[in-house]
């Protein structure tokens, strides 16, 4: 039998604890094509996720709201997911292979209020956004155009300090993530 605490949030209780206890490399991103290697420390991951959580809340997203996340293998994927956890926003991560139709299905099934995508998926979201009545916020990793918001700019506008009044603990029974499972013959379940 597991002893489950009343309040538990992986981003606060594991990530932030690790950042304070022993700040080491949390992620190493290697871009073979560009020949670059970028290390992200636990402290950076913790601080950026706190900034992003506050940015989501500043946009009006609340505990229990959903966000569709389609970001490739890059450090921001982790920052976004941990930020969603800290804000109580339910993340719905998706693979880079998702089509515009796949993204629309996920957004509509969950009533997602935000999409957070890498640049390569902006065109897909633009193609379906009018079909997604709950979608209110479009966030892109990198530079933003039109009514899209830049992840970097959103994070830069927020303080990284963790104030429990701003980012309160949530019950361990809260939904953290929705994972759509699918195969090649049917819609996701």
Label each residue range with its predicted role.
Residues 1-11:
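Flexible, non-catalytic linker and terminal segments flanking ANL/adenylate-forming cores
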Residues 10, 39-40, 98, 170, ...:
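A broad, structural micro-motif
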Residues 14-41, 142-146:
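AMP-dependent adenylate-forming
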Residues 23-25, 140-146, 159-187:
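Conserved pre-ATP/AMP-binding loop-to-beta segment of ANL
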Residues 26-82, 99-104, 152-156:
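Conserved AMP-binding/adenylate-forming core of the ANL superfamily
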Residues 58-59, 82, 86-153:
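Structural core segment of the AMP-binding/adenylate-forming
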Residues 65, 89, 173-174:
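Surface-exposed loop/turn positions
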Residues 67, 84, 115, 175, ...:
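Conserved S/T- and glycine-rich ATP-binding loop of Class I adenylate-forming
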């Amino acid at each position: 039998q597991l002893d489950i605490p009343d309040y538990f949030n992986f981003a606060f209780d594991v990530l932030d604890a690790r950042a304070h206890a022993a700040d080491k490399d949390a992620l190493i991103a290697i871009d073979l094509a560009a020949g670059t290697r970028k290390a992200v420390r636990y402290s950076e991951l913790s601080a950026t996720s706190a900034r992003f959580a506050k940015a989501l809340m500043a946009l009006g997203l609340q505990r229990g709201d959903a966000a569709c996340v389609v970001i490739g293998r890059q450090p921001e994927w982790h920052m976004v997911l941990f930020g969603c956890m800290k804000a109580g926003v339910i993340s719905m991560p998706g693979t880079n292979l998702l089509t515009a139709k796949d993204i629309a299905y996920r957004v509509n099934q969950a009533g997602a209020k935000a999409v957070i995508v890498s640049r390569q998926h902006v065109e897909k979201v633009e193609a379906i956004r009018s079909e997604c009545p709950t979608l209110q916020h479009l966030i892109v990793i990198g530079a933003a155009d039109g009514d899209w918001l830049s992840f970097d700019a959103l994070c830069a506008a927020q303080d990284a300090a963790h104030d429990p009044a701003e980012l309160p603990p949530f019950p361990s029974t809260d939904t953290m993530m929705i994972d759509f499972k699918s195969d090649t013959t049917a819609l996701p379940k």
